């Protein structure tokens, strides 16, 4: 049996590739690594990594048995995914942009002769857990703070015990599970949203609706694929929704009603200086997807 340790005090790197941002990824880092031959265990500790505008600290351990078992623990003061990941455009409801979105995803290396492995195959091929804490996280233009996540995978069943963070004056929690032990994959999430500005969410996912206001929501949704297109087309679920101080641009319902009344009654005078928007102090509804 042989054990060895390595202390890497400085590592400079630069990455370029089809699946990376145009400017690439560059940075520096340091870490300690240890291999225990008897236990087939590789551990990385004191990880300190910088990448573009982001930084990561923490460690990783993996036991390389027939079915690897891993443990990941990462923290960050600032993680900007918008400078680390390629953002593909979202297709519209009619699928007119689907070919454009597909073309934006450049080809990846082929894995064996059967093509690329299924997206969730890693959940069946290994077990593990991950704890993530990010003071500042930027994704699709959304600036999250105090992000805290805890995930555990066992035999193809991923439990998202915690996935929460602050966004502006509000808070989002997204616990759930992904069962990849069978076919098709089945995912269930129970979002809890409190006092989130809806305009920023709509903008992040390229929705053209001109709506603003404070959104709160509790619900449960399920589907067989985790992406924006699948959520629009095939996910199902229910939620209770509340909005405060909401504003819908381009349509004034009160003005529409008054115009309808004045057309049928010449004695009624409609106000002419309405803003071209509908404003509601409070709105609540039950929604089904």
Where are these regions (language model features)?
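Solvent-exposed beta-strand/coil patches in large extracellular/periplasmic or lumenal scaffold regions
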Residues: 2-4, 11-49, 96-192, 214-289
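Outer-membrane beta-barrel proteins
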Residues: 10-11, 81-85, 198-202, 248-252
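Beta-strand-rich interaction surfaces with strong enrichment in secreted/lumenal proteins
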Residues: 45-46, 206-208
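A structural feature that tracks compact, well-ordered secondary-structure segments
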Residues: 47, 59-61
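Internal alpha-helical scaffold/solenoid segments in large eukaryotic proteins
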Residues: 51-54
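Flexible beta-edge/linker motif
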Residues: 62, 67-84, 229-231
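Terminal amphipathic helices with adjacent charged low-complexity linkers/tails
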Residues: 88-94
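Conserved catalytic/acceptor-binding region of the Class I
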Residues: 211
């Amino acid at each position: 049996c042989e054990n060895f340790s390595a202390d890497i005090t400085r590592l400079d790197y630069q990455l370029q590739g089809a699946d990376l941002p145009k400017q690439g990824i560059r940075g520096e880092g340091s870490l300690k690594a240890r291999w225990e031959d008897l236990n087939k265990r590789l551990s990385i500790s004191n990880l300190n990594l910088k990448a573009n505008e982001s930084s990561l600290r923490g460690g990783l351990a993996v036991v390389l048995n027939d079915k690897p078992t891993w443990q990941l623990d990462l923290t960050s003061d600032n993680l900007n995914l918008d400078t680390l990941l390629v953002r593909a455009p979202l297709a519209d409801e009619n699928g007119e942009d689907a070919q454009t979105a597909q073309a934006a995803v450049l080809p990846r290396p082929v894995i064996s002769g059967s093509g690329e492995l299924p997206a969730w195959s890693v959940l069946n091929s290994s077990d593990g857990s991950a704890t993530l804490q990010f003071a500042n996280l930027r994704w699709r233009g959304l600036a999250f703070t105090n992000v805290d996540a805890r995930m555990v995978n066992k035999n193809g069943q991923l439990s998202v015990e915690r996935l929460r963070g602050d966004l502006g004056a509000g808070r989002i929690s997204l616990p759930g599970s992904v069962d990849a032990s069978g076919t098709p994959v089945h995912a269930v999430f129970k979002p809890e949203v409190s006092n989130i500005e809806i305009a920023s969410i709509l903008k992040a996912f390229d929705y053209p609706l001109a709506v603003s206001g404070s959104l709160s929501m509790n619900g449960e949704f399920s589907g067989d694929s985790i992406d924006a297109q699948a959520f629009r087309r095939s996910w199902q679920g229910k939620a209770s929704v509340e909005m405060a101080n909401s504003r819908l641009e381009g349509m004034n319902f009160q003005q529409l009603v008054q115009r309808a009344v004045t057309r049928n009654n010449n004695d009624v005078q409609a106000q002419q200086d309405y803003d071209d928007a509908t404003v509601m102090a409070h709105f609540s509804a039950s929604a089904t997807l």
